[in-house]
Amino acid sequence: MAGCRGSVCCCCRWCCCCGERESRTPEELTILGETQEEEDEILPRKDYESLDYDRCINDPYLEVLETMDNKKGRRYEAVKWMVVFAIGVCTGLVGLFVDFSVRLFTQLKFGVVQTSVEECSQKGCLALSLLELLGFNLTFVFLASLLVLIEPVAAGSGIPEIKCYLNGVKVPGIVRLRTLLCKVFGVLFSVSGGLFVGKEGPMIHSGAVVGAGLPQFQSISLRKIQFNFPYFRSDRDKRDFVSAGAAAGVAAAFGAPIGGTLFSLEEGSSFWNQGLTWKVLFCSMSATFTLNFFRSGIQFGSWGSFQLPGLLNFGEFKCSDSDKKCHLWTAMDLGFFVVMGVIGGLLGATFNCLNKRLAKYRMRNVHPKPKLVRVLESLLVSLVTTVVVFVASMVLGECRQMSSTSQTGNGSFQLQVTSEDVNSTIKAFFCPNDTYNDMATLFFNSQESAILQLFHQDGTFSPVTLALFFILYFLLACWTFGTSVPSGLFVPSLLCGAAFGRLVANVLKSYIGLGHLYSGTFALIGAAAFLGGVVRMTISLTVILIESTNEITYGLPIMVTLMVAKWTGDLFNKGIYDVHIGLRGVPLLEWETDVEMDKLRASDIMEPNLTYVYPHTRIQSLVSILRTTVHHAFPVVTENRGNEKEFMKGNQLISNNIKFKKSSILTRAGEQRKRGQSMKSYPSSELRNVCDEHVASEEPAEKEDLLQQMLERRYTPYPNLYPDQSPSEDWTMEERFRPLTFHGLVLRSQLVTLLVRGVCYSESQSSASQPRLSYAEMAEDYPRYPDIHDLDLTLLNPRMIVDVTPYMNPSPFTVSPNTHVSQVFNLFRTMGLRHLPVVNAVGEIVGIITRHNLTNEFLQARLRQHYQTL
């Protein structure tokens, strides 16, 4: 068995020799490395913790509700709206800082290099120009990579991590202030360093961090700065603000508030309502107009004109006045757009496949090595990218005659060109007077300027240049995404796709004779096709692109192209963000399960090996349970016995638990008496028996299936009260799986808080003497609750008793063992649950379900077992 545990059985992952896997908990499966594909088996996986999106309605929370009236409710709602507005404004200011810094560094770099190239073209010292460009790029990339060493979670775009967070997975450090600082400064250095990355993706992460941290008014990174702000101290509230912040990030990046709202809905949040929709849209609007206000004032000096809605502006698409037959697009063009969507889906699937292999190589060979290796890899990517850009511009670029269109652009494009200096958009590197280098015009401009060139400058790029640019950019962008620098993928994908679309337009014009088609439209459709093939978003991306173009007539072709690209790409692999989520082993829950999973029931996927606590438990037992398990919640149970009165006489602790059990049993007669209706027709002895007797008698048990039986045996009751009577190998199956009446759930964080604050009572006293904590005191340490291993045991009396009933959740969501998996999945995902108890018909807990039991890989394993038992 040891051999099976230490290695992975590749030929028969679920065969008899690996039978031990079937008894492992979902946490063990995650730690030991179960993956969906055999080729991914060597990749490490991590036991991610879930977030508490379900509200715990315990006694402290009920006390808060009792003090709540309409006035306080309106005040709470008003504070939430103000916080949402502040999140939008702060996200817009973050975008303004990133954009201003990138422009400053990029203009400085290109200005120095362009002057050097112009001088060295005649003197023959181009190697010096290359060294200057390398000096700038390597310095910026080195700084970006160093920031990732400080906070590794700042690497990449952050969209996969935020998607996981909104799905209910706690990714360590993802919404910390230090992460925000490293992400913001890192992305401006990586973009300024000439890497083929974008700043729009990290803006989504930055907005999410602002949304998570601003309502707390405190930070782990700045522990001394604390405010007594009593609101929003739960994962449930933080999730809503993170959704708003992520949407604000999209809105600030693209000037698309509606698209940002739909992005947060489509890619992130598992729970949504009308009130949250309004707040998210308001937050997105606040971010968009904050950024627009300051950018318009800084760049044009016209404060309040609102001319630049986002970091990326596509400009207005408009045919030239001289071409009367030109149309933005016609019905005949839809056929070409569908074909481009298919090609974009294939290219996106290829991009994702190559990037996945690179990511797996990094996880095997780069990440296990010293952190300096990651910095060296980033510098290597920067070195190769810089050399390729410089050499391609010098060798592969064509010198083309500068036309009036190239010099000034059309009227719709004039505003954008003027804001960035007309002379900087057309590069004459290595070309004589009155000509320009088309390859250098794409490579030696910012990515946003290059996209605008492809969208609006007609006839400025040859097909050979576009093809070479696409190939080089495709390969280098694929290599760059995943390195240890903050990096986005939206703009590189748009630029790569725009080059592909312009290439298609040039071919149709030159070889098919469609001289009146608008090249900018094909560039936009190509950008949408490639981006859709990479990220596989449809609804939100359609709206984002429409808002960015400010042209509603593009709605149909963009939507058709994105749908075709997604369907084509899905035939081969998942979107790039889902690929990276899968490689990291995050237990992400999709929108729904496969149809065949309905063959399984809750009893097939639940974990029957339970670690539980009693309503009244000694501190010694609680500490033992907390220190020997990694579970984050424990069922609160009492044992189901018929001879309970025998044990109530000699043990006060057992007596307290049995009394709680009897008081918690609700009967129809007891409820009727509570409501004050007349019960005089019932004899008092009969009424007493009805109120106190057990809910139902148990049927004879079958020997074949002990896991689903709840039998009564003559064993010692409540063994978990005494650590020396904890489950042992000598116990029978009946003793291990004894019948347990379910009363509620208590979280690990709640138990540790009770121990830290000394909430307990002596056995000689009544449980009413136990100190009580308020809701504010229970949530004071949120989100960093104390750890049980940091607890000083010398300060605790192990014989003291803790009454957990006031602090447990007495009414969590539960399911029957016969509930189909699709119903379990929908309940778990839509309600944002962390634990789902499985309770039988007589109120006894028989198992518990976590998100690890609902992952696709776990369900596939259980489905294979189901087929084997048929």
Curated annotation (Swiss-Prot):
GO function term, MF aspect, one: voltage-gated chloride channel activity
Protein name: H(+)/Cl(-) exchange transporter 6
Family, as annotated: Belongs to the chloride channel (TC 2.A.49) family. ClC-6/CLCN6 subfamily.
Mediates proton transfer from the outer aqueous phase to the interior of the protein, annotated site positions: 200
Residues carrying a glycan: 410, 423, 433
CBS domain segment(s): 606-663, 808-869
PTM summary: N-glycosylated on several asparagine residues.
Intramembrane residue ranges: 159-166, 241-253, 257-265, 520-534, 535-537, 538-549, 550-553
Phenotype reported upon loss of the gene: Reduced pain sensitivity and moderate behavioral abnormalities, but have normal fertility and are generally not very different from wild-type.
Keywords, alphabetical: Antiport, ATP-binding, CBS domain, Chloride, Endosome, Glycoprotein, Ion transport, Membrane, Nucleotide-binding, Phosphoprotein, Repeat, Transmembrane, Transmembrane helix, Transport
Modified residues (Phosphoserine): 774
Role description: Voltage-gated channel mediating the exchange of chloride ions against protons. Functions as antiporter and contributes to the acidification of the late endosome lumen. The CLC channel family contains both chloride channels and proton-coupled anion transporters that exchange chloride or another anion for protons. The presence of conserved gating glutamate residues is typical for family members that function as antiporters.
TM helices/strands, residue ranges: 81-113, 128-150, 176-194, 200-217, 277-294, 335-364, 371-392, 463-482, 488-512, 554-572
Motif (Selectivity filter part_2): 198-202
Cytoplasmic side: 1-80, 573-870
Amino acids binding ATP: 631-633, 850-853
Motif Selectivity filter part_3, chain ranges: 488-492
Free-text tissue specificity from the UniProt record: Detected in whole brain and in hippocampus neurons (at protein level). Detected in brain, trigeminus, dorsal root ganglion, spinal cord, eye, kidney, testis, skeletal muscle, thymus and pancreas. Isoform ClC-6c is expressed only in kidney.
Site (Mediates proton transfer from the protein to the inner aqueous phase): 267
Enzymatic reactions: 2 chloride(in) + H(+)(out) = 2 chloride(out) + H(+)(in)
GO CC field: late endosome membrane
GO BP terms: chloride transport
Topological category with respect to the lipid bilayer: Multi-pass membrane protein
SMART domains hit by this protein: CBS
Top-rank taxon, per record: Eukaryota
